[in-house]
Amino acid sequence: MQITKREFLKRLGLAAGAGLAGAARADEYTFTGETLPPGSIGDPTKPGFAKNIFPLPHTIEDVPSAFLKDGKVIQPAREVPVFHRTDVVVVGGGPAGFAAAVAAARQGAKVALVERYGSLGGLFTNGMVLIMLATERKEASGKWTFVTRGICEEFMKRARALGADVCNRIPSDTDDIHVQPTVDPEGAKYLMDTMVAEAGVEMFFHSWGVDVIQDGRKVLGVVFESKQGRQAILAKQVVDCTGDGDVFFAAGADYRQITHAMGWVTRLGNIDRVTA
């Protein structure tokens, strides 16, 4: 098959953007009709450069642009391509979304995790809110007991095992002082990536959940935006871990708007520790 240089560059640019967006998986890059020899991928001068090298859900020309009419911006109706089908889709890759996705995958479900940024952790890692809250309970005697279990407990123990103060303190059952552990943000991102990959969760970074797909009151999936455009994921179960209830809101659920407290997080480096 022969294509023009302009068409090749357009496909290459679109696919590069989709790859950076995390919305394109390796198994979508199909080559039909031929077995590719080494070095032929992406090279139109070699055998195997086939018509489906960068299959996109639509081309630029297929997407209708918004336009002005009587001073209003009108968005034409369009088909939203179904990009993926799964058992469970989790929207939001913060601590809650990370734990929900890993837990569901470990139970045998096929899980997709949609995260708007390029790393896991949400405000926990990217927002530097690094304190592990509610890890302990104060007994009647005044003693603090470590009560965290499940995936959070596993995360803390594995973070501690990484060393380099990734998790700087994990209280034991014998501690009689109250300690809130903190975690290094980059170490936490690495560990979350590791646990998600181990569980077999399918990750979609740089993908922002913007709407839901409904049949009456039943939610059948989510619509998300990425560099590849607006696409849909169909799922048997949809889990809202956006932090702000974005999926609930899009589905028409009742909500109450509140103002969260402000915080100022700082970190210091190259300072010797002194024990008081």
What is each stretch, according to the model?
Residues 88-109:
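N-terminal Rossmann-like FAD-binding beta1-loop-alpha1 element of flavoenzymes
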Residues 2, 7-86:
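Extreme N-terminal leader/targeting segments of oxidoreductases
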Residues 13, 39-61, 67, 83, ...:
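Conserved N-terminal/central alpha/beta ligand/cofactor-binding core
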Residues 11, 225, 241-242:
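Short, well-ordered coil/turn residues at beta-beta hairpins
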Residues 245-276:
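Rossmann-like dinucleotide-binding core of oxidoreductases
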Residues 237, 241-246:
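Glycine-/small-residue-rich beta->alpha transition segments that form the dinucleotide
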Residues 214-231:
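Conserved beta-strand-loop-beta-strand element in the redox core of flavoprotein oxidoreductases
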Residues 84-86, 228-237:
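Core beta-strand elements of the Rossmann-like FAD/NAD(P) dinucleotide-binding domain
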